[in-house]
Amino acid sequence: MSYETVREADPAVADALEGERGRQNDTLAMIASENHVSEAVMEAQSSELTNKYAEGYPGERYYGGCEYADDVEELAIDRAKELWGADHVNVQPHSGSQANMGVYLGVLEPGDKILSLDLTHGGHLSHGHPANFAGQVYEVEQYKVDEETGYVDYEGLHDHAEEFEPDIIVSGYSAYPREVDFERIQEAADAVDAYHLADIAHITGLVAAGVHESPVGVADFVTGSTHKTIRAGRGGIIMCDEEYADDIDAAVFPGSQGGPLMHNVAGKAVGFGEALAPEFEQYAQQTVDNAIALGEQFKEHGLSLVSGGTDNHLVLIDLRPSHPDTTGKEVEEALEEAGIVLNANTVPGETRSAFNPSGIRAGTPALTTRGFDEDACREVADLIYKVVDAPHDDDVVAEVSDRVDEMTDEYTLYE
């Protein structure tokens, strides 16, 4: 994209925009929740729809002049239904967290009970952490992964549900490298007459492509964000059975949002259309294959992976067994200096602060978008290990940085 007009109007902002484009082009994005959208999605998100207020839903707006807003939203809805096989879809949430809020407001009362995965075990803030709205409005208890295996303790979850009697059980996670057994979680919900919300923010694209089990038709509600593995730009989405449609729509608007961001809805429509193409399934499978290769190479270097590997787009490394004196934050900062951007992350049984934890999380969605295959990801694992093993060695960091420069030149991104 050209920023010539921005530069004429505001050189300082143009400098930041061009700097960010250069940063993305010249570094390897391995934060598991990040990806690179197409130029078409970015064009849609910077369209004249940014000017349009469209409170309400297609055919039922509170303002005039919404015919094209209706067209775009209906395209996004229809394409989402085709991608995920959902009965009802709301594409207006501004984010995945807003989508979760829409479900909570739609079917819960303040003080109702939520059972969700502990944040340090791979859950998400919006699933009921005390710092988040969900933890402040609802009564929340959290289930765990088995610290020995790294897998969700489904039996423990079932027992916890029977004891706590939640109104809703949340599945779907932000740092869990294994396939989620939505059927088993639904069984736990059925046993206590609870709703089941499956938050697939991280795996929307994997589910759409059929390379991960789908919760659609299993869970009562499915939420997600649209900028991770689905590559449809920033935003959220809610899917549900038709019986819940009115409650969910009312909880989004007017319950928790005003006018939708129609330029972002346009980006969703374009991204969903791209995901309906046959090559998207190949992309999703390659993303998983790349993560598996990345994890296997880490293990060759003696690093400890939570759960021993991955079934999806991310790997979670516990540094304590191999590098007990090194924190995830040290590694994150050294890798960023070398041009590899991932994040420090808590791990099951965490003993350090969440701001300086014992693990690192690495994802392959953005690398795969650039064209990386398994061999390239194995080399990236080698580079990461060099920095893990010597995060304060300037020569090592410089050596890795030089190789990253070569790789970003080979696997180009935005012109």
Curated annotation (Swiss-Prot):
Which Gene Ontology terms cover its molecular function? glycine hydroxymethyltransferase activity; pyridoxal phosphate binding
Cite the position(s) of the site with description Plays an important role in substrate specificity: 227
The top EC class is: transferase
- Where does this protein hold (6S)-5,6,7,8-tetrahydrofolate? 119, 123-125, 353-355
* InterPro entries registered for this protein in UniProt: PyrdxlP-dep_Trfase, PyrdxlP-dep_Trfase_major, PyrdxlP-dep_Trfase_small, Ser_HO-MeTrfase, Ser_HO-MeTrfase-like, Ser_HO-MeTrfase_PLP_BS, SHMT-like_dom
Keyword annotations for this protein, in alphabetical order, are:
Amino-acid biosynthesis, Cytoplasm, One-carbon metabolism, Pyridoxal phosphate, Transferase
Any GO CC annotation of this UniProt entry: cytoplasm
| Intracellular or extracellular location(s) | Cytoplasm
The cofactor(s) it depends on are:
pyridoxal 5'-phosphate
Q: What's the Enzyme Commission number for this chain?
A: 2.1.2.1
PTM-bearing positions, type N6-(pyridoxal phosphate)lysine: 228
Give the SUPFAM superfamilies listed for this entry: PLP-dependent transferases (SSF53383)
- One Pfam family per UniProt: SHMT
**Involved pathway(s):** One-carbon metabolism; tetrahydrofolate interconversion; Amino-acid biosynthesis; glycine biosynthesis; glycine from L-serine: step 1/1
Which transformation does this protein catalyse, written as a reaction? (6R)-5,10-methylene-5,6,7,8-tetrahydrofolate + glycine + H2O = (6S)-5,6,7,8-tetrahydrofolate + L-serine
Coiled-coil-forming residues are none
Database matches in HAMAP family: SHMT
Q: Which NCBIfam families match?
A: PRK00011.1 (NF000586)
Q: What does the sequence similarity comment in the record state about its family?
A: Belongs to the SHMT family.
What is the protein's known function?
Catalyzes the reversible interconversion of serine and glycine with tetrahydrofolate (THF) serving as the one-carbon carrier. Also exhibits THF-independent aldolase activity toward beta-hydroxyamino acids, producing glycine and aldehydes, via a retro-aldol mechanism.
Q: Its quaternary structure?
A: Homodimer.
What protein name is recorded for this chain?
Serine hydroxymethyltransferase
UniProt organism field: Haloarcula marismortui (strain ATCC 43049 / DSM 3752 / JCM 8966 / VKM B-1809) (Halobacterium marismortui)
